Amino acid sequence: MSRIFISYRRDDSAGFAGRLADGLEAALGAGGVFRDVDDIRPGEDFQAAIRHHLENVDAVLVMIGPRWLAAGAAGGRRLDDAGDFVRMEIATALASGKPVIPVLVGGATMPAEADLPAPLAGLARRQAVVLSDDSWSADLARLAAALGARASARSAATLGVRRWLPLPGQPPGAPGRRSS
């Protein structure tokens, strides 16, 4: 199962999302990144697939480009539409308590809380990462290191770290019994 979920708008940051996915796969290992166009099979219910992957990842990266808040074909902002997939992805991730990391690309700036619909307001309080063309490799390396450290910490917590407790009457560090 993928460890990282990339949420993006195709008409805003698809190229950046693909480049990021490739870089993270190289850094974190094959199969570590979920991106819809790469990981949803033809004929599969994409809404169910997205929800399934969101439930099983360690972190969600929200790609924010210059047109991320722009209006859709109907004229209103897409994020204001409850059926917008980007909105659904972010709201689901925020509600689950998963780490949600805004990734600013193409010179985009972080949206203010007032610019976001209520279910997404928490996104504005997340520390963002900037990926720029001028320093892509260094920016990607920092992000990959942070994601790798986060996943390692989660794995250790999930597996449970066992300590050895000394038997009664034994000094600390002496052979003892396991504690969970």
Predicted regions: what they are:
Residues 108-121:
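Glycine-rich, charge-decorated loop segments at or immediately adjacent to ligand/cofactor-binding or catalytic sites
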Residues 150-163:
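Juxtacatalytic C-terminal regulatory tail of Ser/Thr protein kinases
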Residues 66-70, 107-110:
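Short, charged/polar surface micro-motifs in flexible loops or helix N-caps
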Residues 161-180:
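C-terminal or otherwise distal, non-catalytic regulatory regions appended to signaling enzyme catalytic cores
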Residues 100-103:
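Conserved beta-strand/loop subsegment of P-loop NTPase cores
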Residues 128-132:
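Short acidic-hydrophobic, aromatic-tinged amphipathic segments that line or gate anion-handling sites
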Residues 124-125:
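A short helix-turn-beta junction within AAA+ P-loop NTPase domains corresponding to the substrate/partner-engaging
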Residues 1-67, 73-76, 82, 86, ...:
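Conserved N-terminal substructure of TIR/SEFIR domains
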